[in-house]
């Protein structure tokens, strides 16, 4: 049996509308409760149904109501989520969070503004760390965003397809980099890279995917020896026109990455 607290924001809204429609059809409160339990395996009390029908209860009093309809900002957040960001549940406080830790202040500013745009109130902090570079943290509390991002990635892809430039910018801001001859992005998730490749193709950006590190390959990270748990993939953009189209249509939010991209274009123009 599913509890109301386990439902997403949109699922609760849909359920409220369904409850009200049943009431208009002259179902009793008890009948509505039983019908929802049988049809949807959702446990909802008679008293809650009464409050909903009389508009005397707001189920979002303790939940930030945010705009999860497709938008450039939400698409960007999804791209960032597939890269550097993570979501987690803090059991002590019973709160759900979206968080990202990065070295670039301009990056966290864009993430912060995107979170604000969809209705959240994120916080930014600067944390000094002994074992790695000091980093900026941006964090926002939202059960609705947590549940939204916890969906199958195919559902998130639907938003990304509506705003491909923003999704790709978020993903490349997180995982992308520029070398002397290419733009590249690395990730364990081959399906995610293939999806990104298709989006790039629609923007006239040719890219290729290959294995950057095979499973089991040894790596030294800050003095610690690690082994790749799975094949690690790289998506690369080499062709001059594709690099140019990427710069025009996607680019980076991060200044240092934009500057490297400009240098790559200047180098390509000389040859």
UniProtKB/Swiss-Prot annotation:
TM segment ranges: none
PROSITE patterns, per the entry: INTEIN_ENDONUCLEASE
Signal peptide start-end: none
Pfam hit, one: LAGLIDADG_3
Domain DOD-type homing endonuclease: 77-205
InterPro entries: Homing_endonucl, Intein_endonuc_central, LAGLIDADG_dom
UniProt-recorded Gene Ontology molecular function terms: endonuclease activity
Protein name (record): Uncharacterized protein MJ0398
Organism in which the protein naturally occurs: Methanocaldococcus jannaschii (strain ATCC 43067 / DSM 2661 / JAL-1 / JCM 10045 / NBRC 100440)
């Amino acid at each position: 049996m599913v509890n109301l607290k386990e439902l997403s924001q949109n699922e609760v809204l849909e359920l409220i509308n369904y409850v009200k429609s049943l009431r208009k059809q002259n179902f009793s409160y008890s009948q509505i409760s039983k019908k929802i339990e049988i049809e949807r395996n959702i446990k909802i009390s008679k008293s809650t149904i009464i409050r909903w029908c009389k508009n005397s209860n707001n189920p979002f009093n303790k939940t930030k109501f945010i705009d999860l309809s497709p938008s450039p900002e939400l698409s960007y957040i999804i791209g960032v989520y597939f890269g550097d960001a993570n979501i987690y549940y803090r059991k002590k406080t019973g709160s759900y969070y979206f968080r990202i830790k990065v070295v670039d202040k301009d990056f966290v500013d864009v993430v912060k503004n995107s979170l604000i745009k969809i209705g959240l109130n994120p916080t930014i902090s600067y944390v000094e760390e002994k074992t790695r570079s000091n980093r900026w943290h941006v964090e926002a509390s939202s059960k609705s965003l947590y549940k939204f991002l916890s969906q199958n990635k195919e559902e998130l892809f639907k938003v990304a397809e509506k705003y491909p430039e923003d999704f790709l910018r978020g993903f490349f801001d997180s995982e992308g980099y520029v070398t002397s001859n290419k733009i590249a992005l690395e990730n364990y998730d081959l399906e995610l890279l293939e999806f990104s490749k298709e989006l790039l193709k629609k923007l006239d950006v040719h890219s290729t995917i290959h294995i950057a590190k095979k499973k089991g390959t040894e790596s030294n990270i800050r003095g610690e020896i690690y082994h790749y748990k799975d094949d690690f993939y790289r998506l690369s953009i080499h062709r001059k026109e594709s690099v140019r189209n990427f710069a025009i249509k996607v680019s980076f939010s991060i200044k240092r990455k934009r500057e490297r991209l400009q240098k790559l274009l200047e180098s390509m123009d000389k040859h």
